[in-house]
Amino acid sequence: MKTIHFDMNKYETHVDLEYLKEHGRVEKISDGVIFCSGLENAALHQAVLIDERHRGVILELNEEFVGIGLIDKTNDILEGMHVGVSGKFIEVDLFEEMAGRVIDTTGKMLYEESEEKPTATSPLFCVTPAIMTIDSVTRPLNTGLAVIDSITPIGRGQRQLILGNRQSGKTQIAVDTIINQHDQNVHCIYVAIGLKAAYIAEVIETLRNHGAMEYSTVVATAASDSLTAQYLTPYAGMAVAEALRDQGKDVLIILDDLTKHADAYRAITLLFNRPPGREAYPGDSFYIHSSLLERAVQMNEEHGGGSITAIPMIETLSDDVTAYIPTNVISITDGQLFLKSDLFNRGQKPAVDVGVSVSRIGGDAQHPIIRKLSKNLTLILSQFEELKELLDFGNALDDGSMKMVSDGRLLTELFKQKILSPLSVTELIVILYAFQNGFLTKIPPANIQTFKDLLLEKAHMHKDFESFSAQIETINELNESHIEMLEEIIREAGRLFS
């Protein structure tokens, strides 16, 4: 057998292995993601630059290629272009004053130009706070919505899901909650994920018109933005929230909505040829939401005492809460508010289905007076829903059952609330006290809204109500003077109404 001798010197091309560790080449482009060779030292979620001008982030690592998602939507990227690792993980820029800003995934100002330089950065992806650094949820975050603050209260540091069909009032609850924080020393962050640009502008305008942008930040990507930008948006919002929390502040973050976030992630993973699972979502869909929402906590005093309260939203189809993403997020959060289209269409706004909605830890943070006045409200509404079905079939009911129906109908009307008109804690106390002590039984349900407006008007005219409101945080129980004041308000409203 003849031996073959190779002359290695004839191969003049020299491969610089060190260069390939930090640099790569675009091999394939596909709908906002690129497949890249090289980048041997690449790490997940590292920021990269394509052709030294297009921003991207590493989202996929395997033996064959490095998968990069493009943050900016562009058609200028070509095969063969240079890809360089920045050496940093993806971050959002922070500024001296975050209130009033509308930013994108990386902290860049939207809708207006700014010469201001960022003062710091915050990583989009980080480890959840250690269990020894967090504290119990003991302080309320009032939404200003009677049905929520009384039956499914939310505490600072809690994760409370809002889910419901399209056009069932989810965003309106979030906007009302933000507006209600005007004097609560809470910094609000509204995160818009893949929504229509006109819709985002409408929400911003509403917040601005009610003075809420003075203590709010908006992190937004529109439906026309890249899939990667939509996927990164909630993490950018949470990164801003963590920076504020580390300053000892209380933060409320609204995630509108995680269904679109999951859809964007599903599209990205399918483009990277990852095997699909249930409903074509990838196997780590639960992880992307749990790793995000578990960053919303109440820190203990040794670690600043700040908090992040997260209110994610999920869009359901035909009120189906058993679908993959809704069940995932329900199991991650501390409770949920389920909005029913049927209730919304009947004029019950907010359209909260009390039978399915729950707040597992918010009761510990509820104001003691509200907690006492709300103790049997869920039972009243549940009994009303059961007995109402019997009435629909023309069944005769005894006097006790008819009283339950009457109370339920009264409470249902009492919980109806106009948009952008949140109630303070003391206003809610007036309303609940009037209901629980039988002052509303003679008022027809159709007139409840008119009487409620009159009741609140008389409350603000009472000489002692302002001082009562100022001291409410330190009052744990109604004394004789408080009860006398409440009954004077109710009697005066009743006298004028009759």
Swiss-Prot record:
Enzyme class: translocase
GO molecular function, one term: ATP binding
SUPFAM superfamilies: C-terminal domain of alpha and beta subunits of F1 ATP synthase, N-terminal domain of alpha and beta subunits of F1 ATP synthase, P-loop containing nucleoside triphosphate hydrolases
Keyword Magnesium annotated: no
Membrane topology per record: Peripheral membrane protein
GO CC annotation: plasma membrane; proton-transporting ATP synthase complex
Gene3D superfamilies membership: 2.40.30.20, ATP synthase alpha/beta chain, C-terminal domain (1.20.150.20), P-loop containing nucleotide triphosphate hydrolases (3.40.50.300)
Site positions per UniProt: Required for activity: 357
CDD domains per UniProt: ATP-synt_F1_alpha_C, F1-ATPase_alpha_CD
Reactions it catalyzes: ATP + H2O + 4 H(+)(in) = ADP + phosphate + 5 H(+)(out)
Swiss-Prot/TrEMBL keywords: ATP synthesis, ATP-binding, Cell membrane, CF(1), Hydrogen ion transport, Ion transport, Membrane, Nucleotide-binding, Translocase, Transport
Pfam families (UniProt xref): ATP-synt_ab, ATP-synt_ab_C
Localization, UniProt: Cell membrane
EC numbers on record: 7.1.2.2
Reported function: Produces ATP from ADP in the presence of a proton gradient across the membrane. The alpha chain is a regulatory subunit.
Protein family per UniProt: Belongs to the ATPase alpha/beta chains family.
PANTHER family tied to this protein: ATP SYNTHASE SUBUNIT ALPHA, MITOCHONDRIAL
Subunit details: F-type ATPases have 2 components, CF(1) - the catalytic core - and CF(0) - the membrane proton channel. CF(1) has five subunits: alpha(3), beta(3), gamma(1), delta(1), epsilon(1). CF(0) has three main subunits: a(1), b(2) and c(9-12). The alpha and beta chains form an alternating ring which encloses part of the gamma chain. CF(1) is attached to CF(0) by a central stalk formed by the gamma and epsilon chains, while a peripheral stalk is formed by the delta and b chains.
Protein name: ATP synthase subunit alpha 1
Lineage: Bacteria, Bacillati, Bacillota, Bacilli, Bacillales
